[in-house]
């Protein structure tokens, strides 16, 4: 039997190509999320954490270190719903405030766990809930569908990419 590049490429997967495709998918969905409006980004995060939260949190090693964000989380609990929404929008828009700087110093995994906690509190009515009449854009729905097509590890990478860039890192401000 003779081997050609055609016969071997159909029989054996190329781990280098699949890695490129994987990183391209993650980068593509991350870019799609970043292009959404602030409120669509927040809605997408809320949906992902409420629908996939049980899968996301155990996979985020920083969840055990959420006590590092406890002070900021307690401040958020004490805010009015309007102030909470402003804070979340400020995070997404990287507005420089004391609270967004406090978030900015958290580790990537602690930021993942932080957003999970916010989603839990939204579900419990402690943090401003998703408005009942909120209607996400077509782009947000398409982005959510693209995110759903990724495997769990890729989804967590996309979420990490998004939450890492939120807030203001005081070391780089």
Which sequence ranges carry the predicted segments?
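Short amphipathic alpha-helical interaction elements located at domain edges
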Residues: 2-173
């Amino acid at each position: 039997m003779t081997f050609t590049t055609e016969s071997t490429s159909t029989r054996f997967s190329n781990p280098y190509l699949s890695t490129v495709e994987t990183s391209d998918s993650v980068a593509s969905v991350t870019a799609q999320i970043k292009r959404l409006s602030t409120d669509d980004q927040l809605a997408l995060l809320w949906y992902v954490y409420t629908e996939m939260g049980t899968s996301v949190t155990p996979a985020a090693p920083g969840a055990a270190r959420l006590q590092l964000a406890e002070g900021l989380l307690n401040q958020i609990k004490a805010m009015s719903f309007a102030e909470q929404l402003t804070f979340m929008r400020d995070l997404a828009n990287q507005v420089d405030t004391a609270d967004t700087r406090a978030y900015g110093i958290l580790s990537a995994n602690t930021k993942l766990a932080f957003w999970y906690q916010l989603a839990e509190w939204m579900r419990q009515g402690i943090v401003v809930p998703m408005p009942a009449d909120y209607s996400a854009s077509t782009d947000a729905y398409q982005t959510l569908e693209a995110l759903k097509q990724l495997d769990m590890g890729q989804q967590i990478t996309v979420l990490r990419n998004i939450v890492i860039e939120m807030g203001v890192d005081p070391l780089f401000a």
